[in-house]
């Protein structure tokens, strides 16, 4: 019989028993894999000594080519070479079409509106393309480390929603990787800098990659990383800089903007090379076709200024959400290859009033942090464990009567988290309840995003408001949501794992947050009106039900007419938009029915006690 070896508490495995785990930065433009070796977290090279793997996959009839050679073939074979696939993860075909001018692929819609890319090898989903990249990184790691991996920590943008996170986990599973945890990229950067520098205090993580931007405000204490607030833009990055330069070339050369896919890829490669050279040079010569011209760093600054300004706007909002002042932030960590652009570093330094930290290679810092966390989760870490506290980017809640959004877990709540809230029935004899799960910051359902619906059946028939339904929202460490509903008296229960088929459209998260600020006053007024309208309807139904049962028996005609008049007035006001008037009329109807309610209670008590002796009542 096989025996399981169990280490004593507090004892780390021996060096030769070290479990192999890696951190993976699955980026829009480039990807890396890193591991802790001899106590130091470092990126792992391929056979040629290269650390960075371009996030590019070229499909041939019988095989997939990943990395540098695939990216080099993008211009000559654009339809079979997939780059920036991270932008497609967890999205629907309609969302992807909005990026059509940036993505020269032939798309076809699959099940659940998922986009598929037509290649010579057949249809490929974004999940499959990402899996090919992850598989290449897994093979590199196992070759370098000399053994099979027990798992990986994979980083994702903090702004990735549930669908995008689930798509990332699916890609890892296809690649044969056990996901120890999905880790927000800014948090991974904090892990790297926190351990390397012993940093404490408030820190901003400015993460500008190829296709996404994240800003996170963290409180760092020894061994504890708490995300106070996050923000960003799912469609902002170095790719936009490249497109701006490409647009400038087209304008300067007097060319048509309607380029074929191959020419488009070639122009973008030229633009990217010019951008990278301008990091160290004041100006560069750009040549495309028969045209050539001089691109200065000053011109580049002008071209990218709108994108830099967008990132700074997100920074200010994140600082405001965190409840701290700009002056309190001690340092800014720069993450992502796009932060090498001088204008970006200058603008960030001016906003936060300090020189940005660039001690660790901005291309490597996320993978290094993920490797440190993977090492800890694999059980290799000695001494004090890391405590990572991520947050959810948008509030989660459900629909209540009147089309109102009731927030159960507010945005920027630390995860993992479970929150429960009790709700009740709206109508007498109600035996089922539809649970509508929502995401967003607005007060009305129509302004929020629907995540899922499920039904709770078997609720015992009761008068309205008597049943107690406890709804529990549970978000795990990967940011994935589960919702359950339970009727407390009967124990009937229903639940759902929220797995939407595609994610938010480009910029929708940012728009939802912006709208929540812009329409805050209007939303509160609309919510107050809906709440009073719902309360008015509830009261009218309750009074009418009571009148039908006991009106003739307990009220004289004058009392019935007085109540009816107040009910008519409330019905009329409830159809309008005067919140205060509805509230006042609810009070008047309640007052005029107080005596009726008291008589009904007396009659109920009298009926309950009828025929019983005093000693029976006392017992």
Curated annotation (Swiss-Prot):
GO terms for cellular component: cytosol. Gene3D superfamilies: 1.20.1270.10, 3.30.420.40, Actin, Chain A, domain 4, Substrate Binding Domain Of DNAk, Chain A, domain 1. It comes from the Bacteria. The lineage of its organism: Bacteria, Pseudomonadati, Pseudomonadota, Gammaproteobacteria, Pseudomonadales. One of its GO terms (biological process) is chaperone cofactor-dependent protein refolding. GO terms for molecular function: ATP binding; ATP hydrolysis activity; ATP-dependent protein folding chaperone; heat shock protein binding; protein folding chaperone; unfolded protein binding. The keyword Chaperone applies. Chaperone involved in the maturation of iron-sulfur cluster-containing proteins. Has a low intrinsic ATPase activity which is markedly stimulated by HscB. Belongs to the heat shock protein 70 family. The keyword Chaperone applies. This is Chaperone protein HscA homolog. Keywords: ATP-binding, Chaperone, Nucleotide-binding.
